[in-house]
Amino acid sequence: MALLASDVPLAPGTTGRAPEALLEPAELAEQRLLAAVAALPPDDAAEPYNEAQDGPWHQARLLLRLHRYAHEVVLGTSDPSLAGPGHALDLHRDAVEAAAAAAAAARTPRIAPATAYALGVLHADQRHEVEAARAVFRETWPYTAAMTAP
């Protein structure tokens, strides 16, 4: 006998279908996302080479994905207003990883100066892409009140 994903029991003692049973966790996921976005460093604190600020952005990306999945389960459809911010955070993650890889490669012992220079330029370019992705996220984030919360 085959079960559809919507028919799989969620936990022992859980009654009802998935959308009803997951309403409260979905609301919690949204609250966590809004809190994470509100905690992001402000624009004026942004520096292109500040890797210490990457962590909160990665956390916001993970929580956005969790919120999108919960939204799809509870409401049966994805929220199109979150596609742009989600894409921006994906680009952010890619640029952060590329910058870190370039920096690590540049620290290789006995690397040719020209190669080290090229990797440094690549690192700088990727850190600027990080800032560009953050700006796109801020522009496309549909809940502007969360961006200005203290």
Per-region residue spans from a language model:
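Cationic, histidine-enriched alpha-helical/coil surfaces that engage anionic ligands
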Residues: 1-150
